[in-house]
Amino acid sequence: GGQTVSSTRIRAALEEGRLDDANAMLGTPYAIDWPVVHGKGIGSGKLGTPTLNQNYPAAALQPCAGVYLTRIYLDGRWRPAATGIGKRPTVDSSENAAVTCETFVPDFSGNVYGQQPVLEFHKYFCPVRKFNSMDELAALIHHAADESKAYFAALNGAK
């Protein structure tokens, strides 16, 4: 408390994984609205957890790699979601693997390619790590999505 809010402090908070601090300084959740692009089809294929992929523009601030409890505005309403940011060590362990932003939206199956839905980051959930199997990765994604549903249900109940 008592420190001046600055873009430098907000950027540092996001990069260091202090999402609560960044959101407090912003006065609203950190959010992106980049176009949904085609991924590699791994989520909808091997994992059974189709994800919305949004590429970070080269100069854009990237929050600390990890899994986040998020909500996304699709088809006229906010939906709880789980978003992973970072390299995907379970899928691609190469040194030059791309940083991705992938969001799993439970109970949603619309085609949103090319759209720019607003994605709000509410809570840091856990770090990105390599799993021994795709089943373990899918279990984490579903667990994070369940936590997101519970988080937003509690938040909405508090209003």
Write out the residue ranges for each language-model feature.
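Phosphate/ribose-recognition catalytic cores of enzymes acting on nucleotide-derived substrates
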Residues: G1, G39-K159
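Anionic-ligand-binding alpha/beta catalytic cores of soluble enzymes and soluble regulatory domains
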Residues: Q3-L52
